[in-house]
């Protein structure tokens, strides 16, 4: 299991790097397999370039090689991603995560060409990220499989389309060296039973040990015990996303004393009471 790290903030709106260090250590000590830095859950589009660099630096230094780092470098502009690959320091980064271009609503051929340019510009492993609920366009199974077959350094997809049929199609027809990773906590268990290799988790920010255990049990074929843990989280899966991500998980972390309780972490009162219960 990987965790899509949140970005903790202070009351003045600046990044709380001390809280970030605590959160990273909490993840590593509780058995996560890798960390996803500067993904959707990190509120990356709202961060400055300097904040992104500093977050990357702080996380890599704290991890110190103990778990792999998957770094988000998404943009709806292909050239921006290429410039990032050319100009930024990727020391300590094990792979990059790149979402389908958002807002532009490209065609399937446009999506293919976006990833083609990126794959050809780096030797780093590239993880595709399909999240049509945020980008406005779905990358089809056909496009995903075409990319997986054409580029050896396109090694996986974080699939958050919510379309189990599409995900199953990818799993059944993918090359052997290409992995499917759940991008949605709530369907991680069923997706693993179909052949996915894990999850890039939101809920893992708050419950890394428990959700890692569920994932490992499922991967080992111990479906009964994995399902028991999955069911323990079912209500929380819903509550954490009622008021949007990452508001829910950040509210949960603030209740746990992991990050500062800020007014901008806005959740409804019914959601808050549900989390407490």
Give the residues covered by each predicted segment:
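Structural signal for well-ordered, non-membrane alpha-helices
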Residues: 28, 60, 119, 168, ...
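Active-site beta->alpha loop and helix N-cap motifs at the rims of alpha/beta catalytic domains
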Residues: 3, 9-136
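A general structural signal for well-ordered alpha-helical segments in protein cores
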Residues: 20, 52, 56, 81, ...
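Generic alpha-helical structural context detector
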Residues: 3, 25, 61, 189, ...
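Shared catalytic-loop signature of beta/alpha-barrel
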Residues: 224-259
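Single conserved hydrophobic/aromatic residue that forms the stacking wall/gate
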Residues: 265-277
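Catalytic alpha/beta core domains of metabolic enzymes, predominantly
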Residues: 121, 134-237
């Amino acid at each position: 299991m990987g965790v899509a790290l949140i970005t903790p903030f202070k009351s003045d709106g600046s990044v709380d790097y001390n809280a970030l260090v605590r959160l990273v250590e909490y993840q590593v000590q509780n058995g996560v397999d890798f960390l996803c830095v500067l993904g959707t859950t990190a509120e990356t589009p709202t961060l400055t370039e300097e904040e992104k660099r500093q977050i990357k630096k702080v996380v890599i230094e704290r991890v110190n090689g103990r778990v792999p780092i998957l770094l988000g470098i998404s943009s709806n502009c292909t050239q921006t991603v290429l410039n990032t690959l050319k100009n930024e320091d990727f020391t300590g980064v094990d792979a990059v995560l790149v979402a389908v271009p958002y807002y532009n609503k490209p065609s399937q051929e446009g999506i293919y060409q976006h990833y083609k340019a990126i794959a050809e510009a780096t030797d780093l492993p590239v993880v595709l990220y399909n999240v049509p609920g945020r980008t406005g366009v779905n990358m089809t199974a056909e496009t995903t499989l075409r990319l997986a077959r054409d580029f050896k350094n396109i090694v996986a997809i974080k699939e958050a389309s919510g379309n189990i049929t599409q995900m199953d199609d990818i799993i059944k027809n993918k090359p052997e060296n290409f992995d499917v990773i759940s991008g949605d906590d709530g369907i991680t268990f069923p997706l693993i039973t179909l052949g996915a290799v894990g999850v890039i988790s939101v809920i893992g920010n708050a419950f890394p040990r428990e959700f890692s255990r569920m994932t490992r049990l499922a991967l080992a074929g111990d479906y009964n015990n994995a399902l028991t843990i999955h069911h323990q989280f079912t209500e929380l899966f819903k509550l954490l996303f009622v008021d949007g991500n990452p508001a829910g998980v950040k509210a949960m972390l603030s209740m746990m004393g992991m990050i500062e309780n800020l007014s901008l972490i806005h959740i409804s009162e019914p959601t808050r009471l549900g989390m407490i219960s």
